Curated annotation (Swiss-Prot):
GO cellular component: cytosol
Protein's recorded name: Cysteine--tRNA ligase
GO MF: ATP binding; cysteine-tRNA ligase activity; zinc ion binding
Organism annotation: Nitrosomonas europaea (strain ATCC 19718 / CIP 103999 / KCTC 2705 / NBRC 14298)
Keyword field: Aminoacyl-tRNA synthetase, ATP-binding, Cytoplasm, Ligase, Metal-binding, Nucleotide-binding, Protein biosynthesis, Zinc
Similarity remark: Belongs to the class-I aminoacyl-tRNA synthetase family.
Residue interval(s) of motif 'HIGH' region: 30-40
Names of required cofactors: Zn(2+)
One protein family per Pfam: tRNA-synt_1e
């Protein structure tokens, strides 16, 4: 039985989909004005892991992850760069897709862009105006009137007074209440705009997700996810919009992943500890980054540091070494086992962990227990199950030898794969000629470069430290 921690009720709840056998899920994606950072990577990997597990349980998953391609930050960056905002967003959408692919993230069922659904947003704003939940300000902006929605604050667990006192809200003399948020922004020079009943303008950020989720998933769906930073105001405002239009709850389970910190400090450009995914991937294999993310529970803070990434790399290397050592033969890979979820003790433990609010740290612990058993017994069946269960988390699917030969850190001065293979052949020839001094010299040169040779009756293999 799958249980999910629901942010709205602040409790673990048994997961019961609205439609048997089907899960409809929406996750807030990127605002594309820059490269993905580690916080984005966590959202991508966390909800990819959720989708994978739901599919493993046999559900058909309709997964929508939007792209915000019109926003104040996008417009500001495009003006700074002296380029069309559409060119800017196209570039960073491509970069985001490349980063997601590198991290092993499965493409969502749908990836709508906000600019393609402006008509739906206008229709939703009209419905809110008709229900007197919104108003047109004197400057042409349209605002949501939070005092007209009695449930405002229920996701964040705060009253209107608490929110006014404790949250930073934009001061705008056109608002009736400081917490009122914009649904439609009147056009300004040099900004993209669309025709509307209130004049030319563009949608506010919050209405975008309400409109796109309804377009693909209807007025009620199973799971809405995103980063913890979106809980207020973004998701709070989505509730006000969608429930305001339809008069009922539109999401059954709210999921939020925790923050990413760097060396126990908040990640920010001002502190000089802001890292993009691309920067991290110049130093670590993509699978190491994915493994680092899934080793932590999705709701816990994730602390990025070189020490933690190096530890993740070493741990993943141990698992791949087990797969390499217990392949049926030197030249073949471990076959992926068919998982017996009912009768295999390791599979049952793995399922129990994942059904407990997607407890990936406990699931990873099962992988290491399997690895230990494979080493203890030498039985390749354990390695096969290790690979199969790892695949559920999007891990351990590379050929082991290929993974182990990947450079630990990408830097100048390292031997290429071709150079390493040539030196191994030179060493082999030296040994045939009984020139053991030359063979030892070649081994030492490779060892100094972080290349470990492993001799066996089947030949010599190598890996990087």
């Amino acid at each position: 039985m799958l249980k999910i921690y629901d942010t709205l009720t602040r409790s673990r709840r048994e997961f019961i989909p609205l439609t048997p056998g089907e899960v409809r899920m929406y996750v807030c994606g990127m605002t594309v004005y820059d490269y993905c950072h580690l916080g984005h990577a966590r959202v991508l990997v966390v909800f990819d892991s959720v989708v994978r597990w739901l599919q493993t349980l046999g559900y058909k998953v309709i997964y929508v992850r939007n792209i915000t391609d019109v926003d104040d930050k996008i417009i500001r960056r495009a003006l700074e760069n002296h380029e069309p905002f559409s060119a800017l967003t196209a570039r960073y959408i491509q970069a985001m897709e490349e980063d997601a692919m590198a991290l092993g993230v499965i493409s969502p069922s749908f990836e709508p862009r906000a600019t393609e659904y402006v008509d739906s947003m206008i229709a939703m704003i009209e419905s809110l105006l008709n229900r007197e939940l919104a108003y047109v300000a004197s400057n042409g902006d349209v605002f949501y009137d939070v005092r007209r929605f009695p449930g405002y604050g229920k996701l964040s667990g705060k009253s209107l007074d608490d929110l006014r006192a404790g949250e930073r809200v934009e001061i705008d003399t056109n608002k009736r209440d400081p917490l009122d948020f914009v649904l439609w922004k009147a056009a300004k020079p040099d900004e993209p705009s669309w025709d509307s009943p209130w004049g030319k303008g563009r949608p506010g950020w919050h209405i975008e997700c309400s409109a796109m989720s309804e377009h693909y998933l209807g007025d009620q769906f199973d799971i809405h996810g995103g980063g913890q930073d979106l809980q207020f105001p973004h998701h709070e405002n989505e509730i006000a919009q969608s429930e305001g239009v339809h008069g009922h709850s539109h999401v059954n389970y709210w999921m939020h992943n925790g923050f990413v910190r760097v060396d126990n400090e908040k990640m920010s450009k001002s502190l000089g500890n802001f890292f993009t995914v691309r920067e991290v991937l110049t130093r670590y294999q993509p699978e190491v980054v994915r493994f680092f993310i899934v080793r932590a529970h999705y709701r816990s803070p994730l602390n990025y540091s070189d020490a933690h990434l190096n530890d993740a790399r070493s741990a993943l290397e141990r698992l791949y070494t087990v797969l390499k050592n217990h392949a049926p033969s030197q030249d073949s890979e471990v076959a992926t086992a068919v998982i017996d979820w009912e009768n295999n003790v390791y599979a049952r433990r793995f399922m129990s962990a994942m059904n407990d609010d997607f407890n990936t740290p406990e699931a990873v612990a099962v992988l290491f227990d399997l690895a230990s058993e494979a080493n203890r017994t030498g039985d390749s069946h354990y390695a096969s199950l290790l690979k199969a269960l790892g695949g559920v988390l999007g891990l351990l699917q590379q050929p082991p030898q290929q993974y182990l030969q990947y450079p630990a850190h990408l830097q100048d001065g390292q031997y290429s794969v071709e150079e390493i293979e040539n030196m191994i052949q030179q060493r082999l020839q030296a040994r045939k000629e009984r020139n053991f001094a030359q063979a030892d010299t070649l081994r030492q040169q490779l060892a100094e470069a972080g290349i470990i040779l492993e001799d066996s009756p089947q030949g010599t293999t190598w890996r990087r430290e």
